[in-house]
Design a protein with these regions (language model features):
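Conserved AMP-binding/adenylation subdomain of ANL enzymes
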Residues: 167-186, 196-241, 245-262, 334
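Conserved AMP-binding/adenylate-forming core of the ANL superfamily
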Residues: 1-44, 61-71, 118-127, 161-163
């Protein structure tokens, strides 16, 4: 558990540690592992002092025999610091990829013989005037992140995300969803921070609105969806974000578990899907479950965006009665329609 005050104190310490090590837009921080509190602190600490952070899909490290995508990203970024939560889990990629002179920072389980720095050491750095100066220098065009596209059409491509992009997205969200200012959001989310949906949209909604984020250690796959179910029994979100396959995996549990269904819908203001089309039958099942539990439909909406737009381009900010609607251009956004040739 981490409060906003504690997060700021620790982010400043990490920011000081990164400045002392000379990190910059030319030599950023690179993250190999999944969502975690330490991952969030590194991300916040880096952005606090104007150092870009590049979260990389853990699958590139753990599901690949040759770690080719990580090699390509490392060669492009030339990171000055590489973080992994578990040194044993990521030992393969740490040994296979040439990270140059980058400092390897590990949360736990440092492999024998590998030179590395414990993550806790970053938190020991004293934050002084240099952090204040660096923070004051952060502006709209400061690079916040390098996010990498999924690589579905080739090698992952690096996308620059500036503070202007992140902040304008959140300004648009608050204009479209004014209820966020009335009640701080409570979100349980598994969506990865190496992807724009989980990081720039969901994480930043919590950050911008003083909300509470519970990191879901489950995923919509057999053997891990059960963790999400267990977490939803304990946490009643006010907004629930997921991709269509996530809802497909969750719905059978909601249908048969009265306690889970009660917890899920107790405080729910909004159901949000994105990243793919939601089949109409799943939409109807979610509607039926909501009516069964609370006697009325829960508002369901969607959005359309891209890594390059950090991420929102269009948004549904009105009630709809079917899936497949991507909404209207978000405030500050223009969309040009071109013929499909």
């Amino acid at each position: 558990r981490l409060t906003f005050s504690e997060a700021l104190t620790q982010a400043r310490a990490i920011g000081a540690a990164l400045l002392a090590r000379g990190l910059s837009a030319e030599r950023p921080a690179m993250v190999l592992s999944d969502n975690s509190i330490d991952h969030a602190l590194l991300m916040l600490g880096a952005m606090h002092v104007g150092v870009p952070v590049a979260p990389v899909s853990p699958a590139y490290s753990l599901m690949s025999k040759d770690c080719a995508k990580v090699k390509g990203i490392a060669a492009l970024l030339k990171p000055s610091l590489v973080y992994a939560a578990d040194g044993a889990k990521f030992a393969g990629v740490l040994g296979a990829v040439d990270f140059g002179d980058a400092e390897i920072v590990l949360g736990a389980n440092a492999p024998a013989g590998m030179k590395s720095t414990p993550f806790g050491e970053l938190l020991q750095q004293q934050a002084g005037a240099e952090v204040d100066r660096a923070f004051a220098a952060v502006g709209p065009d400061t690079i916040a992140k390098f996010l990498f596209t999924s690589g579905s059409t080739g090698e992952p491509k690096g996308v620059i995300n500036t503070q202007r992009m992140l902040c304008s997205n959140q300004q648009a969200v608050t204009q479209l969803w004014p209820f966020l200012g009335e009640k701080p959001p409570v979100i349980l989310d598994w969506l990865p921070w190496n992807h724009t949906f989980g990081a720039n949209h969901n994480f930043n909604i919590v950050l911008a609105n003083g909300g509470t984020l519970y990191i879901d250690d489950g995923k919509p796959v057999p053997g891990l969806i059960e963790k999400t179910v267990a977490n939803l029994r304990e946490v009643s979100p006010t907004i629930y974000f997921n991709v269509p396959r996530g809802f497909d995996a969750l719905i059978p549990f909601l249908e048969k578990d009265d306690g889970l269904r009660k917890s899920f819908f107790r405080d729910l203001q909004l159901i949000f899907y994105a990243a793919a089309a939601l089949p109409q039958n799943l939409w109807e099942k979610l509607e039926d479950l909501s009516i069964r539990e609370r006697g009325k439909r829960t508002v369901m909406v969607s959005s359309w965006g891209a890594t390059e737009t950090a991420p929102m381009v269009t948004s549904v900010h009105f009630e709809i009665d079917r899936a497949g609607v991507i909404g209207l251009p978000a405030p500050g956004t223009e969309v040009k329609m071109v013929p499909n040739e």
